[in-house]
UniProtKB/Swiss-Prot annotation:
This protein's encoding gene: queF
Entries under PANTHER family matching the protein: NADPH-DEPENDENT 7-CYANO-7-DEAZAGUANINE REDUCTASE
Job description of the protein: Catalyzes the NADPH-dependent reduction of 7-cyano-7-deazaguanine (preQ0) to 7-aminomethyl-7-deazaguanine (preQ1).
Annotated active site: 48, 55
EC number from the UniProt entry: 1.7.1.13
Catalytic activity, reaction form: 7-aminomethyl-7-carbaguanine + 2 NADP(+) = 7-cyano-7-deazaguanine + 2 NADPH + 3 H(+)
The organism of origin for this protein: Thermoanaerobacter pseudethanolicus (strain ATCC 33223 / 39E)
UniProt-recorded name of the protein: NADPH-dependent 7-cyano-7-deazaguanine reductase
Family assignment from sequence similarity: Belongs to the GTP cyclohydrolase I family. QueF type 1 subfamily.
Length: 133
């Protein structure tokens, strides 16, 4: 029996398709407080860089704002830009953290990616940033 799937592959895009420029921020009126802001979506997806198969995840973005909040529509477009990008799960979560920290300069930020099982293994990635004191 031959492996008819051995050479099968779906096209993927490179990192240049991640649309960081779509991200926008809005001013935060309570920078003196340590309010925790949390966004959760079950719709995050990227693709495996080797097979092109989808990697779907629940994504939690948790942060303590300094002077800015992320504008939610821009966040949705940004996250959707990962849809056909071939990127490792661990790299995607760290890239999201880096891009949001650059935009918002928060006091603290944590990105959690809970990826659906593949091959019987579920992956949970936690990337953190804390502003130096």
């Amino acid at each position: 029996m031959t492996d008819k799937y051995k050479e099968r592959r779906f096209d993927t895009y490179g990192y240049e398709k991640i649309d960081k420029e779509v991200l926008e921020s809005i001013e935060y009126e309570y920078p003196e407080k340590n309010t925790i802001v949390e966004y959760i979506t079950n719709e995050f997806s990227s693709v495996c860089p080797w097979t092109g198969l989808p990697d779907n995840a629940k994504l939690t973005i948790r942060y303590i704002p300094s002077k800015k909040l992320v504008e939610l529509k821009s966040l949705k477009y940004y996250l959707t830009s990962y849809r056909n990008v071939g990127i490792l799960q661990e790299h995607a979560i760290n890239r999201i953290l880096d891009d949001l920290v650059e935009l918002l300069q928060p006091k603290f930020m944590e990105i959690i990616g809970e990826f659906q099982e593949r091959g019987g293994i579920a992956t949970r990635i936690v990337a953190k940033y804390e502003k130096e004191k």
